[in-house]
């Protein structure tokens, strides 16, 4: 979803555009396991399916015994202090942020929300019960993506909580490597951990 030739090669609005298309399902796998499973599922899937792949090799998040279904997110970690909802390659960064937070005795939940549409509202609502805060992380514009979807559910359900959307702002992005750009826009594991602490302290 990314190239180093400037803003024209930064695919950060695709989810927002495609979410508006009727019956089009959107999946963003976070590791090799999710990638393999969504490809296998896509063969016999009855509706149009958009799969967004990252460019670089991804770290292993899931074990091979994990179940996978389009439209059903996966709980990677569980803790009561804060919930990270992430998708695609940002799941790995959220995972690393949680490892930093665990050193300070914070216990966090991590949801790999690989399917943006249809969205797993049941898992989202179940995961945020009794938590102190929610952070969404996505390699996408803050408009029209994962964070905005979560915000709309919170508003419709009249849930008041500490909530933070982390993505790309409404501006032309800086140029650099994928890692450098994500770090610049507050998606380094260290910065995510700091944001989490500030959100719930």
Describe the role of every protein-language-model region:
Residues 2, 52-201:
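Thiamine diphosphate
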Residues 1-44, 195, 200:
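Conserved thiamine diphosphate
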């Amino acid at each position: 979803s990314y190239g180093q030739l400037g803003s024209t090669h930064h695919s950060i609005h695709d989810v927002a555009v495609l979410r508006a298309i009727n019956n089009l399902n959107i999946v963003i796998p976070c590791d090799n396991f999710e990638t393999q499973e969504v490809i296998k599922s896509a063969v016999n899937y009855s509706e149009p399916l958009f799969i967004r792949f990252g460019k670089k090799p991804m770290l292993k998040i899931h074990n091979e015994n994990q179940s996978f279904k389009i439209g059903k997110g996966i709980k990677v970690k569980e803790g009561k202090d804060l919930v990270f909802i992430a998708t695609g390659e940002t799941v790995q960064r959220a995972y690393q942020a949680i490892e930093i937070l665990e050193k300070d005795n914070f216990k966090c939940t991590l949801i790999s929300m690989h399917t943006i549409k249809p969205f797993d509202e049941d898992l989202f609502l179940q995961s945020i019960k009794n938590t102190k805060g929610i952070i969404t992380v996505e390699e996408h514009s803050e408009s029209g993506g994962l964070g905005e979807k979560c915000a709309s559910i919170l508003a419709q359900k009249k849930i008041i909580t500490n909530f933070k959307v982390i993505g790309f702002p409404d501006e032309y992005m800086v140029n650099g490597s994928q890692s450098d750009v994500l770090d610049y826009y507050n998606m380094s594991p260290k910065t995510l951990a700091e944001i989490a602490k500030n959100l719930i302290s």
